[in-house]
Amino acid sequence: VDAGFGGLRDDRFTRRLRVADYLDLTDGDTTGFFRDDCDHGTRVTRNIGGFSNDTLLGLACKADYYLVKSDLEHGEPREDERRLCRALAWLAQRQVDVVNISLGYTVFDDFDGYTPQMLDGRTALCSRFLDSLLDAHPRMVVVQSAGNEGKNKWRHISFPGDVAEAVTVGAADSEGTGRSGKSGTGYYPHPVKPDLVVYDSPNGTSFSTPVVTGLCAALMGYRPMKRRELIRLLHASGTRSAAPDLETGYGIPQCDTLLGFLDTPAELQTLPLNATQ
């Protein structure tokens, strides 16, 4: 779900991806979907599964892609939040396994009713909707960007990144030991948010998030599992799994650790249950 997929069918890293279906919720245009002036979604998709003959940018290069434009590139009307809900419903109807949302909401041009104190997963419209959708679809995984408010007045993650079973992804600093300055932080101690961080390239949590989306798709392809089990694995593999915090969550997920868990079923039974609390 994004703000535009301009150039996706011409970009050397995304032109060979399998697009199963697509939808424009902003104006209903389908003929010009891939000629959009905005290419934010295309750049995000590169990090999910982009590849060329000699380069692999994302891990989900063999997935089927369902693309939805729900957000306006310029301005922040509250209708963007409503369209996100409709986009998620459309994807759920198509039984999409893993959803990437490199969008997030805090304040709007025409609505100022949200505050950081409302980051409880139960208050914002899109958070309530996503929470109920995930409850109805235990195998659906939604990977949500933490947002780039870390240096702004808001400071914290954006909605719907506060939903307990959304995999909320922030951005790590260049050393991989802390939070990139503008990456949003968690507000409440439980559940820990963001869940994970990844180095962002290009800059911003919009581009760290799809790295984790590609990882989730690859893991689900390797061994299908329910969402809670996947989240528990991701948390347990993180570089800060022993001491998660509101800056970097459970840290950077480690692929070698994840594969070790998957290849040794006994280890799965000993992972801490509080990893998803």
Residue ranges of predicted features:
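Subtilisin-like serine protease catalytic core
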Residues: 1-23, 29-80, 94-97, 110, ...
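Short pre-catalytic strand/loop immediately N-terminal to key active-site residues, enriched for Gly-Thr
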Residues: 28-36, 199-207
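Catalytic-loop motifs flanking and including active-site residues across diverse enzymes
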Residues: 40-44, 207-212
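Substrate-binding/access-modulating region of protease and related hydrolase catalytic domains
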Residues: 51, 70-159, 201-210, 247
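C-terminal subdomain of the subtilisin-like protease fold in secreted/lumenal serine endopeptidases
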Residues: 100, 221-277
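Alpha-helical segment proximal to the catalytic Tyr-Lys
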Residues: 169
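Carbohydrate-associated surface elements
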Residues: 172
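Short, small-residue alpha-helix embedded
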Residues: 208-223
